[in-house]
């Protein structure tokens, strides 16, 4: 996050002394103040991108309405119009996500009146851009806040979370253990770690460390690349390697998602699958690293998220979303809403530690 929007995204943004409308109005005023100080397009872009990394769907709608009177050529109008048009569902719900900064690198999104026992907790490990491959409200817009809480983690040191998270701890194990003092994983129906790109391997590690139900790693780096990154910063990869090699029971379900036409990501997925029991889901027709962005561009983000999460995004009862098929784009170039069962690209592999 840039310093320019620190006040907008500071911990404790959802304080109990003000209403959601008052907090959104305060955020809007802070946004206007920040962009008024920008003198270059790069400065504007930095502010807008940083805000996109934090705001909720309700805040996007509020900003969109408030900025509708701006001149069409104004940067603020163009930015919020693009952001609002990109919302996958754009549904006004009975309860809405509110955000609360737990510390510098941790933001909690929750509809507070809802019971955690009815919800799935998603712990998101963002990549180096501090987002899950796209603006945060686009991801949140796919989820029913009555059924999901989301905790987004950000690695400002850009060392695969190995130096911890400010305010939680100075290493991965300490930071993740301290997270439980803010968010009670055991209070939820189930808990899933969800990491993209540089956050992929940490998501797998977190699921093992915290005994989560599932880990989803989208376009993760292969472990050798993570180890090399740590080495360049004088950090040891021993704790990460040991955790990947451990087999606590019950062991979390691990799903690795990658673009079928991206050679490096395919190789990284295969390499990780040799280290940890996992399934690999290859997204056909996708040649880019940013798999979630590709699904969004094809209008398939909500059903794709339901598929990889293995449950409905809208209903309490789990949906039937067995990963026995690839997610494809038809030969016409348009998205196919149904998987092609006869052409599976889901590859389970036995635990490598049990191989003969």
Language-model regions, residue ranges each:
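Alpha/beta-hydrolase fold nucleophile elbow
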Residues: 185-197
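Cap/lid segment of the alpha/beta-hydrolase catalytic domain
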Residues: 151-171
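Alpha/beta-hydrolase active-site loop
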Residues: 166-185
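The feature captures the conserved acid-bearing segment of alpha/beta-hydrolase catalytic domains
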Residues: 228-295, 307-320
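Flexible, membrane-associating and regulatory peripheral segments of lipid-active enzymes
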Residues: 1-121
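Glycine-rich nucleophile elbow surrounding the catalytic serine of serine-hydrolase chemistry
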Residues: 195-207
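Active-site nucleophile loop of the alpha/beta-hydrolase fold
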Residues: 217-227
